[in-house]
Amino acid sequence: MTLSDLRDYFKSDFPWKESISVGKIDKNKERAVCFYHSKVSRPKINTIGGKGNRSYTVLPISILLRFGKNYEAAAEKAEEIYNFFDEKTFDLNNERVFVISPYNAPIDLGTDDQGVFENSLEFDLYITKKGD
């Protein structure tokens, strides 16, 4: 599974009509969401017998949300996206995905230089092949 696959899943199942990207957010837009590989360190998964015996992989992701200059609206939208993903299970590209956040809520990042509120949403995607 790639971040583009996840972006496309979000685009098809969540009511979001604003800017959406992978790897680089459009800072010219007041409303935008971007999917990144997480920079938060996670422990390595070791499997007895090697990677071929592993039944799942973990993909840590970060979602950056820019959502206008109203704090309440930005916090509400961040919570909506958080609730859309947290503790969710879905199938994508012949893989089963289990989503867990290491945090209890979105992370409020404050505003950028233009006064646009930003939130970070952190998730770990546990991915198994369907049938495993």
Residue ranges and their predicted role:
Residues 67-90:
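Mid-chain, well-packed structural core segment of small domains
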Residues 49-55, 112-116:
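Short, solvent-exposed beta-strand/turn "edge" segments of beta-rich domains on protein surfaces
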Residues 1-11, 61-72:
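Short N-terminal helix-initiation segments at or just after the protein's N-terminus
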Residues 1-51, 88:
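Small/polar-rich, solvent-exposed N-terminal microdomains that initiate assembly or binding
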Residues 85-130:
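Acidic-leaning, charged glycine-interspersed low-complexity segments
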Residues 3, 7, 127-132:
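Short hydrophobic/aromatic patches at helix-to-coil boundaries
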